[in-house]
Amino acid sequence: MCCRPDTSWEKENRDFYCPECAGAIHWAPVVFARISKAGKCVGEKFASRYYDAMGFGMLMYIGDLLPDIASASCADHTTILPFPLYNTVVFDNPDNAYSVNADGALLYSCSTLGCRKTLEEAICKSSVLTSLRTGDIVAVELSEPCLLSSRSDKEKVVAATFCDNDLFDFKIIW
Protein backbone atom coordinates (compact mmCIF):
# COMPACT_ATOMS: atom_id res chain seq x y z
CA MET A 1 0.00 0.00 0.00
CA CYS A 2 1.27 3.47 -0.79
CA CYS A 3 -0.05 7.00 -0.84
CA ARG A 4 0.35 9.47 -3.67
CA PRO A 5 0.47 13.26 -3.29
CA ASP A 6 -2.31 15.39 -4.77
CA THR A 7 0.15 16.85 -7.29
CA SER A 8 0.36 13.45 -8.97
CA TRP A 9 -3.35 13.58 -9.89
CA GLU A 10 -4.07 14.54 -13.50
CA LYS A 11 -7.59 15.97 -13.54
CA GLU A 12 -7.69 17.64 -16.95
CA ASN A 13 -6.73 14.89 -19.42
CA ARG A 14 -3.62 16.76 -20.55
CA ASP A 15 -0.69 15.30 -22.43
CA PHE A 16 2.06 13.88 -20.22
CA TYR A 17 5.56 15.26 -20.79
CA CYS A 18 8.09 12.77 -19.45
CA PRO A 19 10.67 14.05 -16.99
CA GLU A 20 14.27 14.20 -18.20
CA CYS A 21 15.34 11.61 -15.62
CA ALA A 22 12.95 8.99 -17.03
CA GLY A 23 13.96 6.39 -19.56
CA ALA A 24 10.69 4.49 -19.36
CA ILE A 25 7.15 4.85 -18.05
CA HIS A 26 5.41 1.87 -16.49
CA TRP A 27 1.70 1.69 -15.77
CA ALA A 28 -0.95 -0.31 -13.93
CA PRO A 29 -4.73 -0.25 -14.44
CA VAL A 30 -6.74 0.58 -11.32
CA VAL A 31 -10.26 0.53 -9.98
CA PHE A 32 -10.93 3.29 -7.47
CA ALA A 33 -13.60 4.60 -5.12
CA ARG A 34 -14.38 7.93 -3.51
CA ILE A 35 -14.72 7.68 0.27
CA SER A 36 -18.03 9.16 1.43
CA LYS A 37 -17.77 8.55 5.17
CA ALA A 38 -14.88 8.98 7.58
CA GLY A 39 -13.73 5.88 9.40
CA LYS A 40 -10.97 3.85 10.99
CA CYS A 41 -10.58 0.04 11.08
CA VAL A 42 -13.55 -0.60 8.79
CA GLY A 43 -14.85 -4.18 8.92
CA GLU A 44 -15.60 -6.12 5.71
CA LYS A 45 -19.28 -6.27 6.57
CA PHE A 46 -19.47 -2.46 6.59
CA ALA A 47 -17.03 -1.48 3.82
CA SER A 48 -19.77 -0.83 1.24
CA ARG A 49 -21.07 2.00 3.45
CA TYR A 50 -17.82 3.95 3.14
CA TYR A 51 -17.83 4.75 -0.59
CA ASP A 52 -20.46 6.17 -2.89
CA ALA A 53 -18.95 6.09 -6.38
CA MET A 54 -16.36 4.15 -8.36
CA GLY A 55 -14.30 4.40 -11.51
CA PHE A 56 -11.41 2.98 -13.49
CA GLY A 57 -8.12 4.69 -14.23
CA MET A 58 -4.39 4.11 -14.37
CA LEU A 59 -1.26 4.83 -12.39
CA MET A 60 2.00 5.63 -14.13
CA TYR A 61 5.46 5.15 -12.65
CA ILE A 62 8.89 6.41 -13.59
CA GLY A 63 10.22 3.06 -14.79
CA ASP A 64 13.86 3.66 -13.90
CA LEU A 65 12.90 3.87 -10.22
CA LEU A 66 10.79 0.73 -9.97
CA PRO A 67 10.09 -1.40 -8.08
CA ASP A 68 11.11 -0.39 -4.56
CA ILE A 69 11.45 3.37 -4.48
CA ALA A 70 8.39 5.33 -3.35
CA SER A 71 9.38 8.34 -5.48
CA ALA A 72 8.58 6.26 -8.59
CA SER A 73 4.91 6.95 -7.84
CA CYS A 74 5.21 10.62 -6.89
CA ALA A 75 5.85 12.28 -10.26
CA ASP A 76 3.37 15.02 -11.13
CA HIS A 77 0.40 14.10 -13.33
CA THR A 78 0.93 10.32 -13.14
CA THR A 79 -2.33 9.41 -11.38
CA ILE A 80 -5.08 9.20 -14.00
CA LEU A 81 -8.40 8.88 -12.14
CA PRO A 82 -11.09 10.35 -14.40
CA PHE A 83 -14.23 12.03 -13.09
CA PRO A 84 -17.21 11.97 -13.03
CA LEU A 85 -17.43 8.64 -11.27
CA TYR A 86 -20.00 5.92 -11.77
CA ASN A 87 -22.71 4.83 -9.36
CA THR A 88 -21.68 1.61 -7.63
CA VAL A 89 -24.60 -0.34 -9.19
CA VAL A 90 -22.87 -0.03 -12.60
CA PHE A 91 -20.19 -2.35 -11.21
CA ASP A 92 -22.74 -5.07 -10.49
CA ASN A 93 -23.17 -5.74 -14.22
CA PRO A 94 -20.31 -7.99 -15.45
CA ASP A 95 -21.08 -6.99 -19.06
CA ASN A 96 -19.59 -3.54 -18.41
CA ALA A 97 -15.96 -3.52 -19.50
CA TYR A 98 -12.91 -1.30 -18.98
CA SER A 99 -10.28 -1.23 -21.70
CA VAL A 100 -7.02 0.65 -22.25
CA ASN A 101 -5.33 1.12 -25.63
CA ALA A 102 -1.94 2.53 -26.61
CA ASP A 103 -1.53 3.68 -30.20
CA GLY A 104 -4.71 1.75 -31.02
CA ALA A 105 -3.50 -1.60 -29.64
CA LEU A 106 -5.34 -3.15 -26.70
CA LEU A 107 -3.18 -3.16 -23.55
CA TYR A 108 -5.70 -4.23 -20.95
CA SER A 109 -9.36 -5.18 -20.65
CA CYS A 110 -11.51 -6.41 -17.77
CA SER A 111 -15.12 -6.68 -16.70
CA THR A 112 -16.49 -5.24 -13.48
CA LEU A 113 -16.84 -8.72 -12.01
CA GLY A 114 -15.20 -8.78 -8.58
CA CYS A 115 -14.19 -5.11 -8.59
CA ARG A 116 -16.43 -4.12 -5.67
CA LYS A 117 -15.07 -6.95 -3.51
CA THR A 118 -11.49 -5.99 -4.39
CA LEU A 119 -12.14 -2.35 -3.46
CA GLU A 120 -13.91 -3.22 -0.24
CA GLU A 121 -10.99 -5.40 0.84
CA ALA A 122 -8.62 -2.50 0.12
CA ILE A 123 -10.79 -0.09 2.12
CA CYS A 124 -10.65 -2.47 5.09
CA LYS A 125 -6.88 -2.98 4.86
CA SER A 126 -6.03 0.70 4.36
CA SER A 127 -8.35 1.84 7.17
CA VAL A 128 -6.33 -0.24 9.64
CA LEU A 129 -3.21 1.82 8.84
CA THR A 130 -4.74 5.25 8.29
CA SER A 131 -7.98 7.06 8.96
CA LEU A 132 -10.27 7.43 5.97
CA ARG A 133 -11.62 10.92 5.35
CA THR A 134 -14.56 12.01 3.26
CA GLY A 135 -13.29 12.74 -0.25
CA ASP A 136 -10.27 10.43 -0.06
CA ILE A 137 -9.66 8.15 -3.02
CA VAL A 138 -8.77 4.48 -2.60
CA ALA A 139 -7.30 2.87 -5.73
CA VAL A 140 -6.36 -0.77 -6.28
CA GLU A 141 -4.00 -1.94 -9.00
CA LEU A 142 -5.63 -4.64 -11.13
CA SER A 143 -2.31 -5.97 -12.45
CA GLU A 144 1.40 -5.55 -11.85
CA PRO A 145 3.00 -2.43 -13.37
CA CYS A 146 4.46 -3.04 -16.83
CA LEU A 147 6.13 -1.01 -19.56
CA LEU A 148 3.90 1.56 -21.26
CA SER A 149 6.37 3.77 -23.09
CA SER A 150 10.10 4.38 -23.42
CA ARG A 151 12.23 7.23 -24.66
CA SER A 152 12.55 5.54 -28.08
CA ASP A 153 8.77 5.91 -28.61
CA LYS A 154 8.95 9.72 -28.92
CA GLU A 155 5.16 9.84 -28.53
CA LYS A 156 2.41 7.41 -27.54
CA VAL A 157 -1.37 7.92 -27.48
CA VAL A 158 -3.12 6.31 -24.50
CA ALA A 159 -6.92 6.02 -24.38
CA ALA A 160 -9.43 4.19 -22.20
CA THR A 161 -13.15 3.43 -22.23
CA PHE A 162 -15.68 2.11 -19.73
CA CYS A 163 -19.31 1.27 -20.54
CA ASP A 164 -18.60 2.52 -24.09
CA ASN A 165 -17.75 5.98 -22.69
CA ASP A 166 -14.35 7.62 -23.16
CA LEU A 167 -12.50 7.94 -19.85
CA PHE A 168 -9.26 9.55 -20.98
CA ASP A 169 -7.23 10.16 -24.12
CA PHE A 170 -3.77 11.72 -23.88
CA LYS A 171 -0.28 11.56 -25.34
CA ILE A 172 2.92 10.59 -23.60
CA ILE A 173 5.55 12.89 -25.09
CA TRP A 174 9.27 12.31 -24.68
Predicted feature residues:
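Aromatic sugar-binding surface patches on proteins
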Residues: 137
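Short acidic beta-strand-loop surface patches of small beta-rich interaction domains
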Residues: 140-145
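Catalytic-core "active-site belt" of small-molecule-metabolizing enzymes
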Residues: 1-134, 146-174
